[in-house]
């Protein structure tokens, strides 16, 4: 069977109290809808249609890196109406997986099990259901005396007895495309919400003697939807626990998982140790045998193996093997450290490349610089890279020694094996193998009083 997926993502999400569409809110490092798309792709479906409505430009921008198609639901008239918008772009012979865009906890295994159940039973439609201890807010699955599907009753339309049912509709389905779209055209808005319910199409198909299957999943956690900020925080916590467990089982040590925050797409090599109060975000990649933390935050950075980073901040930085960073270092975007570099306490580096084995031990600012191999930058060194209008380059060639409290006024180049005297302000190029000193003469004046 040819598989397509339709993700319903047109809702406003009023309870989020936000200008953003609900599916655009971030959880575990990326927007909710990207978690759903990832699960669908991991389940083996490449043909994905997203139904957009409120904030469609934002949703489309978020998904711009994905190979998906969009259809527009101008008015939010229910789940059935949302699915109908996809009729023109889904082949009638397809089997379609339908799910909401606000369920970031969904896992590919649950979707695969649903699709396999649908295939084995050769059903026209299959509903993924879950038994929940607290089913409040969910539609209930009604079965006949033989346990077969009867219908789904939405909570607002349910009576007191029906509300006692624990088996709920997850909102995730498999359908024969041609038959579900035919049934949807016969649905109405005669219900408490005044909307076109997708669940009514199931009842119509049942009345037409079509086969309706139920796949009862044990993945209660998987189907949690996000409706407000409380649920967003709960989903964040669950996804972080999953990620931490995945990393620990793959050979990464987390000294205190409860205080460690690692985004879903982060990759970390084995025998790396993550100390407490560490945050690793975005698409960061860390090698093997590193020690990170405590109190470190790394965003969208590439870290080699055997790197030590203590109490520091890294943003879009690239760090080669065996570097030593911190404490209290700040590596800003486009910073590259080659192998064996030391960046010590209270050092800020921006848009610079630091050569193999070079050291910037403490209290320095390096911006728009290229530093060669084996360079030592003394305490208090500043690259003066900005004249109020433009940024300029500083170049330190191999084996340069910069004395403490040196100001390097860019553009400037210090030739290889050269030394600057402590306290100098260097504003002209220094030839190789040179000692450069620039100081005002020292004066001794008598004290008064």
Curated annotation (Swiss-Prot):
It comes from Syntrophomonas wolfei subsp. wolfei (strain DSM 2245B / Goettingen). GO terms for cellular component: cytoplasm; membrane. UDP-N-acetyl-alpha-D-glucosamine binds at residues 8-11, 22, 73, 78-79, 139, 154, 169, 227, 332, 350, 365, 376. Binds 1 Mg(2+) ion per subunit. This is Bifunctional protein GlmU. It is an enzyme of class 2 (transferase). It comes from the Bacteria. GO terms for molecular function: glucosamine-1-phosphate N-acetyltransferase activity; magnesium ion binding; UDP-N-acetylglucosamine diphosphorylase activity.
């Amino acid at each position: 069977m040819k598989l397509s997926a339709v993700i319903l993502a047109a809702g406003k999400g009023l309870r989020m109290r936000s200008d953003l569409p609900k599916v655009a809110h971030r959880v575990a490092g990326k927007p909710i809808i990207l978690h759903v798309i990832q699960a669908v792709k991991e389940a083996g479906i490449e043909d994905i249609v997203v139904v957009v409505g409120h904030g469609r430009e934002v949703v489309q921008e978020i998904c711009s890196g994905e190979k998906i198609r969009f259809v527009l639901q101008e008015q939010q008239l229910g789940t059935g109406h949302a699915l109908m918008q996809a009729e023109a772009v889904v082949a009638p012979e397809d089997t379609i997986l339908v799910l909401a865009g606000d369920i970031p906890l969904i896992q590919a295994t649950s979707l695969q099990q649903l699709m396999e159940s649908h295939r084995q039973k050769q059903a026209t439609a299959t509903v993924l259901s879950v038994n929940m201890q607290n089913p409040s807010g969910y539609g209930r699955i009604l079965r006949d005396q033989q346990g077969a599907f009867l219908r789904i009753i939405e909570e607002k339309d349910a009576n007191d007895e029906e509300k006692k049912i624990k088996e709920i509709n997850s909102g995730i389905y498999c359908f024969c495309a041609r038959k579900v779209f035919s049934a949807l055209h016969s649905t109405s808005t005669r219900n408490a919400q005044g909307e076109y319910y997708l669940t009514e199409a199931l009842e119509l198909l049942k009345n037409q003697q079509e086969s309706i299957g139920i796949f009862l999943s044990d993945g209660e956690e998987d189907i949690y939807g996000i409706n407000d900020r409380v649920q967003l925080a709960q989903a964040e916590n669950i996804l972080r626990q999953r990620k931490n467990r995945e990393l620990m089982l793959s050979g990464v040590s987390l000294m205190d998982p409860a205080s460690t925050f690692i985004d879903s797409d982060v990759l970390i090599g084995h025998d790396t140790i993550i100390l407490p109060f560490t945050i690793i975000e975005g698409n960061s990649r860390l090698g093997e045998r590193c020690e990170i933390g405590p109190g470190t935050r790394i965003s969208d950075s590439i870290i080699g193996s055997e790197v030590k980073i203590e109490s520091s901040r890294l943003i879009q930085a690239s760090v080669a093997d065996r570097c030593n960073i911190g404490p209290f270092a700040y590596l800003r975007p486009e910073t590259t450290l080659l192998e064996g570099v030391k960046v010590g306490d209270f050092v800020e580096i921006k848009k610079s490349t630091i050569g193999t084995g070079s050291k910037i031990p403490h209290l320095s600012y390096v911006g728009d610089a290229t530093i060669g191999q084996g360079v030592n930058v003394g305490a208090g060194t500043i690259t003066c890279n900005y004249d109020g209008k433009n940024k300029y380059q500083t170049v330190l060639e191999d084996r340069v020694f910069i004395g403490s409290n040196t100001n390097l006024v860019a553009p400037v180049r210090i030739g290889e094996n050269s030394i600057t005297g402590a306290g100098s302000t260097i504003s002209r190029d220094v030839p190789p193998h040179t000692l450069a000193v620039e100081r005002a003469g020292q004066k001794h004046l008598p004290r008064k009083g």
